[in-house]
Amino acid sequence: IQQINKTAQQLCEYLAVQSWVDEIYYPTISCDALYQKGLKSGGGGAGLFSIVLKSPEKNSPQFYDALQLTKGPSLGTNFTLCCPYTMLAHYDELEWVASIGVSPYLIRVSVGLESLSTLIARFDAAAENINQESYRE
């Protein structure tokens, strides 16, 4: 668990500064002060995070398809999984989900025991498949 926490934290920190990433949802990066206050000291942010890309309606399908991770809605394995969470969990409620600010293009990732460098390489390779003009400022 400690290795998964550490890798997830470092991966989220890396992804948070990439030009093609719009939002990272991970406890130690994107949560409010009240949530931060309740975190257990030394407990880590866990191995689960979500990512929304810039221009997600264009970029998420290509990115997800190119991302060389096992695809599935599970979590807690020793290998990293990803899934288009909102589409899987709320497909019949997409209008409602959008009304509360959740992107239908959110990709959820459950980090496993792969090395940080392996995961960064896979995310970077998938990012090469998206339209760079759509996220440049």
Language model regions located:
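Conserved small-domain helix->loop->beta segment predominantly found in fold-type I
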Residues: 3-73, 77-79, 92-98, 135-137
